[in-house]
Amino acid sequence: MSKRVKEILSWYSSDSPGTRTNLARLLNHGRLAGTGRLVILPVDQGFEHGAARSFAPNPDAYDPDYHFQLAIDSGCNAYAAPLGFLEAGAAEFAGEIPLILKMNNHDVLHDEKDPLSAVTASVKDALRLGAVAVGFTIYPGSTAAQVMYQQCREMILEAKSHGLAAVVWSYPRGSDISKAGETGLDVVAYAAQIGRASCRERVYDDV
């Protein structure tokens, strides 16, 4: 194991050997293996933005297996997707790419300035599919943010109790945040800090 990966694992000394082992699997897979850097292919666009909008420009992408193979061929560290997408190919591609089960999702079928994602999967699902981690999206700035923070924390506790790693995607969104503010450095940094606090760990921001 590389010195850099050992250093990163040392940041998670409060976690179990199982969780640290799964984190090591993420860091030691793909073209960036051992460098301490991560490239994860996330494919939640079909749920979040609609299949036609997301996949029509590249019809092959309608096939869930396409994304597994894309992550593998691209040398990604992991592939992250909602429950249905992972269920479609987890057996066929078992052991070829670390999987991250996206636990909550949001749609755009109605205008919602203060987003609240629905919980669409469970830790049991992640274990059944052989995932190394679960992922959860939070929207700091939304009027529903407090609900998401609680859900996120409960999900992380349960996942880590079973030796899984956890990923938090933290996006500043809400009726009181301007479009420019969504990408403002101070606002994004604040959202990242909230995500870190949710995980109880150091921010992993080596890019």
Q: Which residues make up each language-model segment?
A:
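Alpha/beta enzyme core
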Residues: 3, 33, 38-40, 45-205
